[in-house]
Amino acid sequence: MERGLHLGAAAASEDDLFLHKSLGASTAKRLEAAFRSTPPGMDLSLAPPPRERPASSSSSPLGCFEPADPEGAGLLLPPPGGGGGAGGGGGGGGGGGVSVPGLLVGSAGVGGDPNLSSLPAGAALCLKYGESAGRGSVAESSGGEQSPDDDSDGRCELVLRAGGADPRASPGAGGGGTKVVEGCSNAHLHGGAGLPPGGSTGSGGGGSGGGGGGGSSSKKSKEQKALRLNINARERRRMHDLNDALDELRAVIPYAHSPSVRKLSKIATLLLAKNYILMQAQALEEMRRLVAYLNQGQAISAASLPSSAAAAAAAAALHPALGAYEQAAGYPFSAGLPPAASCPEKCALFNSVSSSLCKQCTEKP
């Protein structure tokens, strides 16, 4: 019974293996037929063996297909056989092929997605590599710089460009065939991601626009710098003129000018100059008063008859002690003068001090 079970298990395993091989062969044939069935207006060629990648770029997680001709009209397709497909429908059977993760071409579309059924048959898609970053890539991606606004999800975009006519047009129409240009938008690839020609042109236009904006901003910054330099030069000249004027003011102010004395500050110089000006004004006022008093005394002495001698005698008569002091002090006038005038005349002579003199005159009999 155990032998029967083993035989049954062996038969079942052989049936499964035969079924797996037949399914793999049919799937490979269907893929080969689908890839080799050339649609109108498209020329497809088989992919050459994949190039050896350098060790530095062997860990690239994404592979893209390169055009077969310089114009990019054809597509490089992987060999029909694969070492084991991923994504629920990959082709298997041959050990020499390279697997494309997640690629499934069937009646429902590419990769089992009905939304992609509108793509022409045999169009190459760069699918998300998923988590298998260590697997070998199918082909090198086209050269070019990576656009700064690419998505970082590692997907590749398929750009279909029509050459001015319907893709289903006759192959004889010049330039009427559909050109499929691939663009890989993988943020992990720093220099190997391909860009469509339009993308490169757009980025070039944006760069030129940015260059124009940078030129205008640099011009504005230069103008602002020149204006700031002019303002600084004007302020520097103004401060130099102010310092020179203050030095001249310190030179005329009477204070101790010596190396041991600290130089006056600007505020101290101005305060000292103000006080000096006020002092000079007060001295001038005192001088004016003195000059006015002297002029008034000269007019009084010229108008009096006995002149100053009579005034001295009158003062001696009124104040004997003062007269004796003046004589002892060597008063230049002699005492032997004519008698003094009457009291009203004295009051008229000394009108400035008539308050006490006239009072004495009025009190006399």
From Swiss-Prot:
All residue ranges annotated as the bHLH domain in the record: 226-280
Alphabetical list of Pfam families matching this protein: HLH (PF00010)
PROSITE patterns: BHLH (PS50888)
Molecular function GO labels: DNA-binding transcription factor activity, RNA polymerase II-specific; E-box binding; protein dimerization activity
Any Gene Ontology CC annotation: nucleus
Keywords: Nucleus, Repressor, Transcription, Transcription regulation
Composition bias, Gly residues: 82-93, 191-216
Residue segments, region Disordered: 34-93, 134-156, 188-225
Main location: nucleus
Single biological process term from Gene Ontology: sensory organ development
Subcellular location: Nucleus
Tissue occurrence: Kidney, lung, brain and pancreas (insulinoma).
Complexes and interactors: Heterodimer with other bHLH proteins, like TCF3/E47.
Role: Inhibits DNA binding of TCF3/E47 homodimers and TCF3 (E47)/NEUROD1 heterodimers and acts as a strong repressor of Neurod1 and Myod-responsive genes, probably by heterodimerization with class a basic helix-loop-helix factors. Despite the presence of an intact basic domain, does not bind to DNA.
Protein name: Class E basic helix-loop-helix protein 22
Species this chain originates from: Mesocricetus auratus
Gene (UniProt): BHLHE22
